[in-house]
Design a protein with these regions (language model features):
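Serine-dependent carboxylesterase/thioesterase catalytic core
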Residues: 44-50, 55-57, 61, 67-177, ...
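Conserved loop-alpha-helix segment in the C-terminal half of the alpha/beta-hydrolase fold
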Residues: 67, 184-202
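Short secondary-structure boundary/capping segments
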Residues: 37-38, 169-172, 194-197
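Short, conserved active-site loop motifs that form the nucleotide-linked donor/cofactor pocket
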Residues: 178, 200-205
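Flexible, membrane-associating and regulatory peripheral segments of lipid-active enzymes
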Residues: 1-47, 53-64, 69-71, 101
Length: 205
């Protein structure tokens, strides 16, 4: 297991992150290692979750790409991603609705905070989840090891305190195929916080 960092990435990496590109392009860029390996679609549904403070627009390019490959793609349906009460229940219902509509399991793809949602949904909706893929998501380690903490607090209206029990719960991967795509040059999340523990059904790319 990688070390557990307590500090966010360097300010220089954060500056590079901010100037890299608009949200939509950045989301697609983060997904490129996975996109290069995606096989032609079989028509099964995929829900894509945006990062903190982002909306469905940020995942449009990724959804369009997956749609061209033959997957049935869906946005998360909740507008801008803010850590407010009721979000997880609404996400849960959307997975159930999409799975019921297609009569098939759903792949869950999440960027940043959206990936944390995807993992938790995969744990609670294993029967409806085909796989989980996260893009630069901080599901492992200390809540202080991200440059998005202040934004999270402002949008959620509450302080982001480190809770060891919650951290351990988030660290555990869903019991479905789970892939984490991360970058050591990530300016928002310390890359060590995006690593799955080694297991037959997990991988880090």
């Amino acid at each position: 297991m990688a070390e557990n960092p307590k500090r966010p990435p360097s300010p220089w990496l954060l500056l590079a992150e901010g100037g890299r590109a608009p949200w939509e392009y950045a989301a697609t860029l983060a997904a490129m290692p996975w996109l290069n390996r995606v096989p032609p679609g079989d028509g099964h549904p995929v829900i894509v979750y945006p990062g903190l403070g982002a909306s469905e627009l940020s995942t449009r390019a990724l959804r369009s790409y997956l749609g061209r490959l033959g997957y049935a793609t869906y946005d998360w349906g909740l507008g801008r991603n803010r850590p407010v009460p009721g979000v997880m229940e609404a996400c849960r219902q959307r997975v159930l609705d999409v799975a019921s509509r297609h009569g098939r399991k759903v792949s869950l793809v999440g960027w940043s905070l959206g990936g944390v949602y995807a993992r938790e949904l995969g744990k609670h909706l294993q029967a409806q989840t085909r796989c989980v893929i996260t893009l630069g998501s901080p599901f492992s380690g200390d809540t202080r090891a991200t440059n998005a903490t202040r934004a999270y607090e402002l949008m959620g209206g509450r302080p982001a305190r480190h809770d060891p029990e919650r951290a351990e719960r988030l660290r555990r991967a869903p019991n479905v195929p789970t892939t984490s795509i991360y970058s050591k040059s990530d300016g928002v999340v310390a890359w060590q916080c995006s690593l799955n523990d080694a297991a037959p059904h997990t991988e880090n790319v």
